[in-house]
Amino acid sequence: MFLTNEKIRQLTVGAAAIYEEAEGLRFTKCTADQLAAWKEAAPWIYANAVGSTGVRLDFCTDSDFVTVKTAEYGKYEVKINGLLHAQYAFREADGNDRINSFTVHPGEGVNRITVSLPSHGPAGIISSVEVADGSFCERHRFDTKMLFLGDSITQGWNTKYDSMSYAYLVSEAFNADSIIQGIGGAIFAPSTVLPMDFAPDTVVVAYGTNDWGYYSDYTTYRNAVHDTLAKVNELYGSAKIYVISPIWRQDCGKTTKVGTFDDCCNTVRDMAALFGMTLIDGDTLVPPIMDYMADAVHPNDLGFAVYAANVIKAMK
């Protein structure tokens, strides 16, 4: 039997907005207002803001198969009972059609199925979900809610498996219903911190590495950090708020118009303290060794595993 669009909505986690289109349901990590704000604040970032990072279907079922039909390119990953089972990568360059489908067979009994939509590129579209006739599907039950605000590192750039980014791994460790608004190229931009229909118990803010090369002077950067955290505090003051300072990068020895990389990181530390937010020091998260990095800025899968483990330890 095919699940209705309403049922698919009920099983969805991590979507700030869901749009019903001719090809199916399109899921985005940002609301329409947030997308408009990013387009105004930093137009070059907009393409990275429209995606479906962190969006997944997460449900328990007694069906012996689950078939998902998609209508967009990208990587779709499936976990069965929390363990990565398969990745289905559909790329136009490989000659794939935009319409694709995949089937998983979880085995007998009740199993938890997690289908992660693409973290990069266009927002994922689910055209249909089919399960065995007469089977049940219930949304996974979570213990808490988390919101991640950050740049490409929070988005999980250069991971081989999207669902192995630190934000995904931290969400899983705390059994969290989470929205992951990781946006490649993102900076501290107060105008983009806007309300949405999601009340997190925990908020994680992780910007700064792009700001170091973006802002024209230190004062402008400092004000952006201050004003962004002020907005986060205004909207989510009742939540536990963590601020992650930038992690090591290969070119951290240079000086930009903002100042040294230490100046950049120390400002984040100081502003977090000003608002009474809990700092997670980026220097303690990933070894300053290129074996843990996919490039000069982003961790690889190994680096993200270590990053996540250290964030989890800091939160506990």
Identify what each model region corresponds to:
Residues 142-227, 250-254, 259-266, 294, ...:
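Conserved SGNH/GDSL esterase-like catalytic core that processes O-acyl groups on lipids
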Residues 236-240:
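A short helix->loop->beta-strand "cap" motif at the edges of active sites that frequently abuts
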